[in-house]
């Protein structure tokens, strides 16, 4: 998760619109697959750069989430294990790249306007709530 004003402030969050299957057109947090030999932190930084044009520093572990997508017959078609971290932008120019159609900074009040991949909205809302609790 990448917040525009850094992980300690509650500004807009960066979303990427998927450019290919599965779930083409849906919005999600930037990310992707690890390459052989990469650490989680290296893979996150590489994927964010490829998808958004931004260089990031991985700041803290957020959580692990599982997502199973089933076909019409109920069989598992995709099974994802998502490891989320909070990141801070170091530089770069925001632009859609790699396998995304668009990237946008989205304010919390507008999140429900975006068609997101399953579970993404609840993860983001919890991140905002967690950040608010840390501030008090």
Regions found by a protein language model. Name each.
Residues 84-86, 95-127:
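NUDIX/MutT-family hydrolases
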Residues 32, 46, 59, 106-109, ...:
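Structural detector for helix-capping/boundary residues
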Residues 5, 65-93:
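Active-site-adjacent beta-strand/loop module that shapes the phosphate/pyrophosphate-binding cleft
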Residues 1-13, 86:
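Conserved N-terminal beta-strand and adjoining loop/helix that marks the start
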Residues 9-50:
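Conserved Nudix-box catalytic region and its N-terminal flanking loop in Nudix hydrolases
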Residues 128-136:
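Generic C-terminal helix-cap and adjacent flexible tail
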């Amino acid at each position: 998760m990448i917040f525009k004003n850094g992980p300690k402030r509650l500004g807009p969050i960066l979303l990427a619109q998927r450019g290919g299957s599965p779930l083409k057109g849906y919005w999600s947090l930037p990310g992707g697959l690890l390459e052989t030999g990469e650490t989680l932190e290296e893979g996150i930084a590489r994927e964010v750069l490829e998808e958004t044009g931004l260089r990031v520093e991985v700041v803290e572990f957020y959580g692990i989430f599982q997502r199973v997508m089933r076909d019409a017959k109920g069989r598992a078609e995709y099974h994802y294990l998502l490891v989320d971290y909070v990141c801070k932008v170091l530089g770069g120019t925001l632009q859609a790249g790699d396998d995304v159609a668009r990237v946008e900074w989205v304010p919390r009040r507008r999140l429900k306007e975006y068609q997101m991949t399953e579970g993404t909205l609840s993860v983001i809302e919890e991140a905002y709530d967690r950040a608010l609790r840390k501030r008090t």
